[in-house]
């Protein structure tokens, strides 16, 4: 993620380093000013030449000017540092917000994955149940087909037996009819013979 206004972690580090260095310079300058003041006090106590006093005074003025310039630079660096810290805070909050959003999205994705996995498991279980039911039905159908085949064999055997019985019955009927015809012919022949004898007896008288 880019840092706004071109600031980076390395930039913030350099600002802090410059800030510390400026503080060291200011402390050194303040120490030097303190020493110069002590020298001036000693000069008041001990008479010195005008040239030496002017040189010391000039040096003191230069140090004060440098000190003031350093303070201005320090103030600018402090302003930059505060601005950088503010940006870091904003970025930290934004990062935390994005982190929470990411964790929420990740949690949602995980939840959906678990739901889909659960649905998948349920579908697999349902398919297994259906497959098991189909296998059972096929076993039942195979059993029924075997029963039907056995019944067909029994029926075929019964039909054959029936046909055999019918054939025997027809033969018996034919035999009975033949016997009846023979008996009828014999009966007719016997009747004819009796009638012939009955016609012959009166003539003999």
From Swiss-Prot:
It is found in: Cytoplasm; Nucleus, Nucleolus; Nucleus, Nucleoplasm. Keywords: Coiled coil, Cytoplasm, Developmental protein, Differentiation, DNA-binding, Nucleus, Spermatogenesis, Transcription, Transcription regulation. One of its GO terms (molecular function) is DNA binding. Residues 138-185 are annotated as: Required for interaction with CBX5 and TBPL1. GO terms for biological process: cell differentiation; spermatogenesis. GO terms for cellular component: cytoplasm; nucleolus; nucleoplasm. Its main location: cytoplasm. Homodimer. Interacts with CBX3, CBX5, GMNN, GTF2B, TBPL1 and the polycomb proteins PHCF2, RNF2 and SCMH1 but not with CBX1 or PCGF2. Belongs to the SPATA24 family. This is Spermatogenesis-associated protein 24. It comes from Macaca fascicularis. The lineage of its organism: Eukaryota, Metazoa, Chordata, Craniata, Vertebrata.
